[in-house]
A protein has these predicted regions:
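Glycine-rich FAD pyrophosphate-binding loop
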Residues: 22, 38-56, 206-217
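A Rossmann-like FAD-binding core segment of flavoenzymes
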Residues: 2-7, 88, 122-125, 129-138, ...
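N-terminal Rossmann-like FAD-binding beta1-loop-alpha1 element of flavoenzymes
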Residues: 19-46, 194-203
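Glycine-rich dinucleotide-binding loop and its adjacent helix/turn
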Residues: 5, 61, 152-207, 239, ...
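Extreme N-terminal leader/targeting segments of oxidoreductases
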Residues: 1-21, 39-42
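Glycine-rich active-site loop/strand segments that organize a redox cofactor
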Residues: 65-100
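Beta1/beta-strand and adjacent pyrophosphate-binding region of the FAD-binding site
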Residues: 13-27, 181-191
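A conserved FAD-binding loop/helix module that cradles the flavin
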Residues: 35-36, 221-228, 324-332
């Protein structure tokens, strides 16, 4: 083919694609990738079905840090009295903390949206699924978008093992939005998410029990860290039940509960233990949001926990087993 013929065919090749990069997921990874790609001259579209910011901003790192900050005031009040301060008995108001969290999340979400707009990224509020290696369908309006490259940055969701009454429990996705403060909290699991919530709710005034399947908390962490955390939590009055797991949740007789499952819940463990809780937080780890995206229809292989099986690549960006479809992986 002559040079002039090659140049003449180039526009038709470019016309095959509506965008250079289509990002599925508006969390930290997707937002960053979209902005950087656009900054290098790529035409970028990003689809998010919920809120911009993803787990970290909306229901993870940011609200958790705000709650931890609030929980530390209880120690400050106690210490102030030892240094001469005379205070009336402090009263903690849960709805005020939730409202403050909502304001900050809304502010940050607005900044994310403004940043994408300023970078020239087109943001679409819709769930997106793959139809082939270069085509994405937007479920909100049925529109199809052709993309040179597709980046999957859909994050993860809580892992929920099957047991009776699991619908009465809550996960880390909803714990920041409870309408009433749980005076008695049972937590299933003893990983870092479970232990973070155990500590902050205990500091806010909850009676906390952690049901741990293993012989210690924080599996996978250094042994000295595990021992230190377990000892510190025990000294703070947090009850740790080792070698056990939740078997069943039941609503107490005559207690209809509320919209966020508020109300007394009977907890039965595998070892025959019985607990009563206002809320049961299920923190058994997380699994990737890769199901129902259309990956398997393309021939992409998913692992046992629904992760995309990929080739090695730097910077936590991996090729899937389908060419042109890329996943942003996460260490959390």
């Amino acid at each position: 083919m002559s040079t002039s013929a090659a140049k003449a065919s180039a526009p038709s090749r470019e016309a095959e694609f509506d965008v250079d990069l289509f990002v599925i997921g508006g969390g930290s990874g997707g937002i960053r990738a979209a902005r950087v790609a656009s900054g290098h001259g790529a035409k970028v579209m990003l689809a998010e079905e919920y809120r911009l910011g993803g787990t970290c901003v909306i229901r993870g790192c940011v609200p958790k840090k705000l709650f931890v900050y609030a929980s530390r005031f209880s120690d400050t009040f106690d210490e102030a009295a030892e240094f001469g301060w005379r205070l009336s008995v402090p009263h903690f108001d849960w709805p005020s903390l939730v409202a403050a969290k909502d304001r900050e999340i809304t502010r940050l979400e607005g900044l994310y949206g403004t940043g994408q707009e300023g970078a020239g990224v087109e943001v679409v509020r819709s769930r997106a699924v793959l139809e082939d290696a270069h085509t994405v369908r937007l479920l909100e309006d049925g529109r199809r978008v052709r993309a040179r490259t597709i980046l999957i940055a859909t994050g993860a969701r809580p892992e929920l093992p099957p047991f009776d009454g699991i619908e009465l429990g809550i996960t880390s996705d909803g714990v920041f939005d409870l309408k009433t403060f749980p005076r008695k909290l049972v937590i299933g699991g003893a990983g870092y998410i479970a232990m973070e919530f155990a500590g902050l709710f205990a500091a806010l005034g909850s009676d906390v029990t952690v049901v741990c399947r293993g012989s210690n908390v924080l599996r996978g962490f250094d042994e000295d860290v595990r021992q230190a955390v377990a000892g510190s939590y025990t000294n703070r009055g947090i009850k740790l039940m080792f070698g056990d797991s939740i078997r069943r949740l039941e609503r107490r007789d005559g207690d209809v509960g509320g919209g966020d499952h508020a109300g007394r819940i009977d907890v039965t463990t595998e070892q025959g233990g019985r607990l009563v809780a206002d809320q049961v937080l299920l923190a058994f780890g997380r699994r990737p949001n890769t199901t129902s995206l259309g990956l398997t229809a393309l021939g992409s292989r998913l692992g046992r926990t629904a992760q995309s099986l990929s080739t090695r690549a730097p910077a936590r960006i991996s090729r899937t087993s389908t060419p042109w479809v890329t996943c942003r992986t996460s260490s959390t």
